[in-house]
Amino acid sequence: MPRTRLIVGAITSALLFSSHAFAADQRFNNVVVFGDSLSDAGNVSLILDPALQTTQRFTTNPGSTAAENVAKALGFSSTASKLGGTDYAYGGAGFVNNATTLPIENIPQQLQQYLAATGGKADPRTLYQVWGGANDIFYLTDTYTDANVIAAGAAAAAQAEVKLLGNLQAAGAKYVVVYNLPDIGKTPESIAAGAAAQSGGTQISLVYNNVLQTGITQLSGSGLNIIPVNTFALINEVVANPSAFGFTNVTTPACGAGSSSVVCGPAGSTSGLYLYHYPAGADQTYLFADGVHPSTAADAMLGQYVMSIINAPGYASLLAEAPLASISAQNRAIRNQMLADGQGSDTRVFASIDYGDQRFDAMSGSPKTTSNNVNLTIGADVRFTDNLSGGVAMNVGQHNADYSGGGGYKLQDISGLGYVTYHQGGGYIGGYVDFGQDNFSDIERRIQLGNYVRNETAKADGNHMGGGVTGGWWFDFSSLRTGPFATVEWQTVKVDGYSENGIDSSAMWFSRQQRDSLVSTLGWRLEGHWQAGNTMLSPYAEIAWNHDDKADPRAVTAGLNSMPGSFSLVGFTPDKTWGTADVGLSAQFTQALSGWLGYSGRFSDNSQKYNSVNVGLKYAF
């Protein structure tokens, strides 16, 4: 296959495509890159001219590569290793054979250089990015004409990449972004060479990717967190519908035929080592900078794509958190009935509606999310003896959640529970158990890819089971009563694994989740009783301290539908300790009918905020 060569006589550029900014990401402590020109942050440009004030990339300069864009989105700087940075990639580098006459390190040597500087250890909290293989193929097509020899060489190069990934894991790495090969047959260089070159480029890319994917499957099974990036599929999607992604040209280079993008800059620019120039705006509308390398806009799009994959487990993690709010509203209504039992209330039926505004704060692993929650609880309570009562209830909850930036989910929770209360003098104690089924619909993950907004949708099922013990003591002072209370509640929420409906490059699957909760509550309650005409009014207030012993960081496993490889990342992490406050007013309208209006709020919680209003009626027999 013919290739675009660097006119400065030294380098064969042999790579294809690469291509929200946040504070430093809490999931990772650094980003390290190994690869070729698709990820080269300036190493080759410094070989060509060590005096360069600004390093140049294989793109429409002064753009950045996809790997750099990923590092930036995570809050890190990825600079060339020749400047002391963590981007070891060199244009022309391969896994087995380089495709350049420049004195550069191949990709395995890049890893060895890094390990030599770290004492042979890879950092388990560092995110590694690996992208290569194209130069091996370019070397093979320049050296051989036998298709079988070329295919065998491509397979050997892919096996060398798998070996490198295994060596990274053996050195201690836990997280690696692995880019597969884009479709070489879709590059301007292949298009210009004719139909045979296009077909051959596509086929050899598939040979490489198939071997790589087999290795990825094995490495994922051995515990390496591989974040798969299907550039082959994504670039084909762009080529099939360029305008949707914001491109007007996907077949010719922005820098011109025969150009090399590492020495290509904007029209009229006199700074830098620029031998070629691209027209104004072409860096944003052309898919390719030169015969095989992506433009600035393409690199930006690829960075968005990678970040959508990395962030996806955080979106999914909120699903297992959501039912706890419905359970809390339900059990709050039930505990109020148990309090009434502690005062010797009659057999009755009751209904309560709770409207809650829930806000999950943004974290490095999950998005800011708002949820409007409505819960209806209906039940019946029977007075067995003067001191013993019990009841059953059913709860239907509907939550509509929206992620910041778009997307969200709907939760329908249907629960049943039973409870029993014993009271004697000023003391009371009770217990309850609950079980519920959850249905998540309209799960939507919104992804920005250049100008294109893609919505990945899914649905999932789940369930929860739990129970609690509560008790307290009343001190009576005429028309006032007050006293302490304590509750211990255990819940287990399970969400079944699910896959998004799409078959495109960004559609993903997510593993089964389990969120355990063990909340201890200590509080103080105050209640008054005053007659207002024919109505008995009972204002109340309570404040409580809560601690969830199981509110630990929880990882969600995910992967692409279209490519092997899986990874587990921590998503939403709830606070372990928070406060709650409740105030309200109940009224006895007749001997049989009473009602209440109340407010419940959550405070001193660094992970979420919750405010709700509840209203209810009960009818005694």
List each model region and its residues.
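Membrane translocator/pore-forming domains, dominated by Gram-negative outer-membrane beta-barrels
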Residues: D346-F621
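Conserved active-site regions of diverse hydrolases
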Residues: R3, A23-D346, I353-A362
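Short, structurally constrained coil/turn elements
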Residues: F17, S220-S222, H423, G533
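Gram-negative bacterial Sec-dependent N-terminal signal peptides
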Residues: M1-D25
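Short, glycine/charged-enriched secondary-structure capping and boundary segments
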Residues: I11, L15, L46-D49, D142-D146, ...
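A short hydrophobic/aromatic micro-motif that marks alpha-helical segments and, especially, helix-coil
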Residues: S18, I310-N311, N606
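Short, Φ-rich (hydrophobic/aromatic) sequence segments
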Residues: I11-L15, A325-R335, W545, Y599
